[in-house]
From Swiss-Prot:
<comment type="similarity">
    <text>Belongs to the complex I NdhM subunit family.</text>
</comment>
<dbReference type="GO" id="GO:0031676">
    <property type="term" value="C:plasma membrane-derived thylakoid membrane"/>
</dbReference>
<dbReference type="InterPro" id="IPR018922">
    <property type="entry name" value="NdhM"/>
</dbReference>
<keyword id="KW-0618">Plastoquinone</keyword>
<keyword id="KW-0793">Thylakoid</keyword>
<keyword id="KW-0520">NAD</keyword>
<dbReference type="Pfam" id="PF10664">
    <property type="entry name" value="NdhM"/>
</dbReference>
<keyword id="KW-0874">Quinone</keyword>
<keyword id="KW-0813">Transport</keyword>
<dbReference type="GO" id="GO:0016655">
    <property type="term" value="F:oxidoreductase activity, acting on NAD(P)H, quinone or similar compound as acceptor"/>
</dbReference>
<comment type="function">
    <text>NDH-1 shuttles electrons from an unknown electron donor, via FMN and iron-sulfur (Fe-S) centers, to quinones in the respiratory and/or the photosynthetic chain. The immediate electron acceptor for the enzyme in this species is believed to be plastoquinone. Couples the redox reaction to proton translocation, and thus conserves the redox energy in a proton gradient. Cyanobacterial NDH-1 also plays a role in inorganic carbon-concentration.</text>
</comment>
<comment type="subunit">
    <text>NDH-1 can be composed of about 15 different subunits; different subcomplexes with different compositions have been identified which probably have different functions.</text>
</comment>
<protein>
    <recommendedName>
        <fullName>NAD(P)H-quinone oxidoreductase subunit M</fullName>
        <ecNumber>7.1.1.-</ecNumber>
    </recommendedName>
</protein>
<keyword id="KW-1278">Translocase</keyword>
<keyword id="KW-0521">NADP</keyword>
<dbReference type="GO" id="GO:0048038">
    <property type="term" value="F:quinone binding"/>
</dbReference>
<keyword id="KW-0472">Membrane</keyword>
Length: 115
């Protein structure tokens, strides 16, 4: 079993080399745990959530067999952050007007008035 928990934290993505057991993260050499949008800045529907989870799986599969390092986690986290931005810009994801944070961290909402 792994002794050290590696993690990557971006604004909307948190990755851990751990398994979630009950409410605790337990370090693991062979499992990554994804915490998506911990501040609830976006409104997620099943389709957009599935797209991010699918992209996460693609990135993990592409990195399989390589060294699991801080660098690898940062690459995956940064790529997911960019993918979330693409979804937002395409109108497949929107900001949560009831979220505790309203700083439009990925740009202003795309509305007909602003286009």
């Amino acid at each position: 079993m792994a002794d050290t928990l590696l993690k990557c934290t971006t604004r909307h993505v948190r990755l851990f080399t751990a398994a979630l057991q009950e409410e605790d993260l337990v370090p693991s050499d062979d499992q990554l745990t994804l915490d998506l949008d911990p501040d609830n800045e976006f409104l997620w529907d099943a389709a957009s959530l599935a797209k991010v989870q699918g992209r996460f799986k693609e990135l993990v599969d592409a990195a399989a067999g390589g060294e699991l390092s801080d660098y690898t986690l940062r690459r995956i986290g940064t790529d997911l952050e960019g993918f979330i931005r693409q979804l937002l810009q395409a109108g497949e994801l929107s900001y949560n007007p009831d979220g505790r944070v309203q700083n439009f961290s990925m740009g202003l909402p795309r509305t007909p008035e602003l286009l």
